[in-house]
Amino acid sequence: MIHILYNFIVNQTEKRYKIYMNDNDFKKAYLDYLNELTIQTITSNKKSIYRISLPYLDSYNDYLDIYVIKNEDGSCTITDDGWTIRMLQDNKTLTEKDIATIKLYDIIKNEDNSLSITCYPGGNIGYCIHNLALCMLKIDSRHL
């Protein structure tokens, strides 16, 4: 049974790889890959909080987790739940350059040390998620 399952997985992987290699839509191939590896889960029914695990590794070889909070006014707050600043404080490496990087990506550092960006109705939530992820990765990579 295990051998059959293994062959199925290998065949599916080879099939997917061949399709992408023969296809000229590289953007679609990349986005499909990201979609396969991105996991979204609900963390709280009360506040409509969703955790999105992105397929990008931090310096601890963990996937980046961000949280999307659906607000009552229809906006969404995208946050790192304090991970970035906490990591810098644990390593005693928080610098002014990190604060400048946060501002560069239109991210807000909150009083609880979480980083966040708000996407209002009609806004581009993909842009907001992408900017927060880039900010987290940029700061994390500076402190390897």
What is the role of each PLM region?
Residues 39-52, 108-114, 141-144:
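Short glycine-rich, low-complexity/disordered patches
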Residues 30-34, 97-104, 129, 136-139:
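Generic hydrophobic, helix-prone segments enriched in Leu/Val/Ile
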Residues 63-118:
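Intrinsically disordered, low-complexity regulatory segments enriched in Ser/Thr/Pro
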Residues 119-144:
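Solvent-exposed, charged helical/coil patches
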Residues 6-11, 17-18:
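Short, positively charged and aromatic/hydrophobic N-terminal segments
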Residues 34-35, 116, 123:
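Terminal targeting/leader modules
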Residues 19-79:
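N-terminal ordered "arm"
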